[in-house]
UniProtKB/Swiss-Prot annotation:
Gene Ontology BP, a term: regulation of cell shape
Organism: Listeria monocytogenes serovar 1/2a (strain ATCC BAA-679 / EGD-e)
Keywords: Cell shape, Coiled coil, Signal
Protein name, UniProt field: Cell shape-determining protein MreC
Keyword Disulfide bond appears in the UniProt entry: no
Protein role: Involved in formation and maintenance of cell shape.
GO terms for cellular component: plasma membrane
Region forming the signal peptide: 1-34
Length: 295
């Protein structure tokens, strides 16, 4: 009896193996429609893959977006830095061009003045509270600079030295509000007219040339230069041009309003006119200066 059941189990096992092999073979055959168990398994697996794939794809895309955004930001920062560097370079080039032009024109001044030793200098400071009054330059007594020396730019006279240190000096501008600031000048024409630069209108930005003869006619655009009568400034340094002329209240003299040739607002490179040994100031010069009341 036990032998029978043993054989029966063996037979069932063999039949099961045969059926399983048949099912496997059947499932491996090419056919258009899958059985419902196969389709069920495929649907479950596909649904699971879809659930996993979408978040994974979203996260991957988000990470890629963040990386791209960071790269774009970094690139923009580099471009911005380059633009700033180019802007700075352009500004430096413009400053160098202007400086080169000023220095070339300063050399032209050097060639045009014979009895004076021109000394080129740079403006190192300017007080905003008295912008029209003074500037500081980088040349002083150790360079031979002395008070009352004329200071010019390529465009014309700007003022005179008032005080000196060893390595710097103070220049009082023609536009100074100091009533004692005077320069002897003349209006060029068929007949020269002499007067004194004394005063500045900050509203019109015009110098005042006073004590001109009441009976002389003047035209807009006539040139005004230093007269040299003060004995300290060389004659012929350009100051500016006439804009208009007014007669004083008493009718005894005229005042011409002069547009400065030099840009008094923007001063960078200047020239100090040092008196040479042959053209030094004498007692006669000092007397002349006191008589005319100007430089």
């Amino acid at each position: 009896m036990p032998q029978f059941f043993l054989n029966k189990r063996l037979i069932i096992l063999l039949i099961s193996i045969i059926v399983l092999v048949a099912l496997v073979g059947f499932s491996l055959r090419d056919r258009e429609n899958a059985s419902w168990p196969e389709q069920f398994v495929k649907d479950v697996v596909g649904f699971g893959e879809n659930i996993v794939a979408k978040p994974t794809s979203f996260i991957s895309g988000a990470v890629d977006g963040v990386v791209d955004l960071k790269n774009t930001y970094t690139e923009n920062q580099h471009l911005k830095e380059r633009l700033e560097e180019l802007a700075q370079l352009e500004s430096e080039v413009a400053d160098l061009k202007k400086e080169n032009k000023d220095l070339k024109e300063s050399l032209d001044i050097t060639d045009s003045i014979r009895d004076y030793d021109p000394l080129n200098a740079s403006v190192i400071s300017r007080n905003p509270t008295n912008w029209n009054d003074q500037v500081e330059i980088d040349k002083g007594s150790s360079d031979g600079v002395k008070p009352d020396m004329a200071v010019t730019t390529p465009s014309g006279l700007i003022g005179k030295v008032t005080t000196t240190g060893a390595k710097s000096a103070t220049v009082e501008l023609l536009t100074s509000s100091d009533v004692k600031n005077r320069v002897s000048a003349k209006v060029q024409g068929k007949e020269n007219a002499f007067g004194i630069i004394n005063g500045y209108d900050s509203d019109t930005k015009l110098l005042e040339l006073k004590q001109l003869p009441y009976d002389m006619k003047f035209k807009k655009g006539q040139k005004v230069v230093t007269s040299g009568l003060g004995g300290k400034f060389p004659a012929g340094i350009f100051i500016g041009t006439i804009e208009k002329v007014e007669t004083d209240k008493m009718g005894l003299s005229q005042t011409a309003f002069i547009k400065p040739g030099a840009d008094m607002y923007d001063l960078n490179h200047v020239t100090v006119l040092k008196r040479s040994a042959e053209a030094g100031t004498t007692d006669d010069d000092t007397t002349s200066s006191d008589t005319t009341g100007g430089q």
